[in-house]
Amino acid sequence: MNRLLVFLMLGAAFMLVVSANDAYGDEPAFKDLNQGDESLGKRKSCCPCWLRGNCFWGQNCYPEGCSGPKV
């Protein structure tokens, strides 16, 4: 009986670890932020225009947050 209980406990622990690793599958991969969806790329490299176009690190200036037309 003790062996069965230990086996079930190990199985439950294994399933918990597997489900915890699956939880990270919803997040976009790092390469998707740089190359994938263009809106994600804009969000990552946008610059508000109140900086008067003085954007750092080659960012683009967007008048309406990150989704507006490039200035």
Curated annotation (Swiss-Prot):
Keywords: Disulfide bond, Ion channel impairing toxin, Nematocyst, Neurotoxin, Secreted, Signal, Toxin, Voltage-gated sodium channel impairing toxin. GO terms for molecular function: sodium channel inhibitor activity; toxin activity. It is found in: Secreted; Nematocyst. Disulfide bonds join C46-C61, C47-C55, C49-C66. It comes from Anemonia viridis (Snakelocks anemone). Residues 21-41 form a propeptide. Its main location: secreted. Residues 1-20 form the signal peptide. GO terms for cellular component: extracellular region; nematocyst. Coiled coil: none annotated. Belongs to the sea anemone short toxin (type III) family. The keyword Disulfide bond applies. This is Delta-actitoxin-Avd2b 2. It holds the Pfam family ATX_III. Voltage-gated sodium channel (Nav) inhibitor. 1 uM completely inhibits insect voltage-gated sodium channel inactivation (DmNav1 from D.melanogaster). The keyword Protein biosynthesis does not apply.
